[in-house]
């Protein structure tokens, strides 16, 4: 159940507290649940005013559901969604096919606006101001920072020609701001039926579908670890508000430091920061009125971030 807030608490926006939420996705009975717990605790530490909804597939065991509930998450079961289970060889990794199920979150119409975060992300600063972004657009961070400025780069992912013209900027689907909408949800599903599977699954699909309403936002809202060695001159790790541990060997709960790039000092520091949050028992969810909840209410719901400053003018398509 979503936490209730004191009616006297004022906010720096007209958005209703109950109408917004963060959302993530979880499948299977593996240890990814640790990532979601870490994310939930990170949002508490950042004094977010909004709950974390976890969209789970039916194969998530009851034990993991109870863990999520104990940490204050709103658990919502969804049905799997995939264009074809017979085309697993089309994906960069076979399990990417599960990620099409993320499209179900457009059906969460009890929320007017949501911020999607992958379960292997961690939030280090309050990002509630993202809910203030103007409606009717999808906001996300470019998958490669060079793409934001139209600079040629070997690290930019190849665009599947079968999906039509390449978007001017290709975003990473590990974090995005969107509005649930039943009409959009139906159109997404209908479009998926006639869209061939591609290497990066739902990420390619979302880039194709939302190319006309996509707005880039700064890398600080989804700092991919690979940017630290691909484009170190463009990255300031201490400015990252949310970090995406998506590189091979980077999942903090599996980290050994043995995979390529994982022995870097900045990676070790970010893994430690994740564990510091995960192991902090003062961030464990408690009932309303607890110290944690009181701190969330006292914290600023929105930072002093200038919302208009988030917009990055994307280069025109070639």
From Swiss-Prot:
| GN (gene name) | GOLS1
Which tissues carry this protein?
A: Expressed in seeds, mostly in radicle tips.
From the UniProt annotation, give the residues forming the signal peptide: none
- What is known about what this protein does? Galactinol synthase involved in the biosynthesis of raffinose family oligosaccharides (RFOs) that function as osmoprotectants. May promote plant stress tolerance.
Tell me which InterPro entries the record gives: Glyco_trans_8 (IPR002495), GNT1/Glycosyltrans_8 (IPR050587), Nucleotide-diphossugar_trans (IPR029044)
Q: What is its main location?
A: cytoplasm
Question: What family is it from?
Answer: Belongs to the glycosyltransferase 8 family. Galactosyltransferase subfamily.
Which superkingdom?
Answer: Eukaryota
Q: What induces it?
A: Declines within 8 hours of imbibition in a gibberellin-dependent manner. Induced by dehydration but not by cold in germinating seeds, and induced by both dehydration and cold in leaves.
**Residue numbers annotated as active site:** 102
Q: Which GO terms describe its biological process?
A: cellular response to cold; cellular response to desiccation; galactose metabolic process
Record keywords, A-Z: Carbohydrate metabolism, Cytoplasm, Galactose metabolism, Glycosyltransferase, Manganese, Metal-binding, Transferase
Residues binding Mn(2+) = 118, 120, 244
What is the E.C. number?
A: 2.4.1.123
Please give the cofactor(s) recorded in the UniProt entry for this protein: a divalent metal cation
> Example GO molecular function term?
inositol 3-alpha-galactosyltransferase activity
Top EC group:
transferase
Instruction: List locations, semicolon-separated.
Output: Cytoplasm
Catalytic activity reported = myo-inositol + UDP-alpha-D-galactose = alpha-D-galactosyl-(1->3)-1D-myo-inositol + UDP + H(+)
**Listed CDD domains:** GT8_Glycogenin
Matching entries from SUPFAM superfamilies are given as: Nucleotide-diphospho-sugar transferases
Q: Cellular component per GO?
A: cytoplasm
Protein name, UniProt field: Galactinol synthase 1
């Amino acid at each position: 159940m979503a936490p209730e807030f004191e009616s006297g608490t004022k906010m720096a926006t007209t958005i209703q507290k109950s109408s917004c939420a963060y959302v993530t996705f979880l499948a299977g009975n593996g240890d990814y649940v640790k990532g979601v717990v870490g994310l939930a605790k990170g949002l508490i530490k950042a004094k977010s005013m909004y709950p974390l909804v976890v969209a789970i597939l039916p194969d998530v065991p009851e034990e993991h559901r109870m863990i999520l509930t104990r940490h204050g998450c709103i658990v919502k079961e969804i049905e799997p969604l995939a264009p074809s289970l017979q085309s697993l060889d089309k994906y960069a990794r076979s399990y990417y096919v599960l990620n099409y199920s993320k499209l179900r979150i457009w059906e969460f119409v009890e929320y007017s606006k949501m911020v999607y975060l992958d379960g292997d992300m961690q939030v280090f600063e309050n990002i509630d101001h993202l809910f203030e972004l103007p409606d009717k657009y999808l906001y996300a961070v470019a998958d490669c920072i060079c793409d934001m400025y139209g600079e040629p780069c070997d690290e930019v992912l190849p665009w599947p020609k079968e999906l039509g013209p390449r978007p001017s900027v290709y975003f990473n689907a590990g974090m995005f701001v969107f509005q649930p909408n039943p009409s959009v949800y139906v159109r997404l599903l209908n479009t998926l039926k006639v869209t061939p599977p591609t290497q990066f699954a739902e990420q390619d699909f979302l880039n194709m579908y939302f190319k006309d309403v996509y707005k880039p936002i700064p890398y600080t809202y989804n700092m991919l670890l690979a940017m630290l060695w691909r484009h170190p001159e463009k990255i300031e790790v201490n400015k990252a508000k949310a970090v995406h541990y998506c590189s091979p060997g980077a999942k903090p709960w599996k980290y050994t430091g043995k995979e390529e790039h994982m022995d870097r000092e900045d990676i070790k520091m970010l893994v430690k920061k994740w564990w510091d949050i995960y192991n902090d028992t003062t961030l464990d969810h408690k009932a309303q009125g607890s110290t944690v909840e009181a701190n969330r209410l006292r914290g600023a719901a929105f930072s002093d971030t200038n919302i208009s400053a988030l917009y990055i003018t994307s280069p025109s398509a070639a």
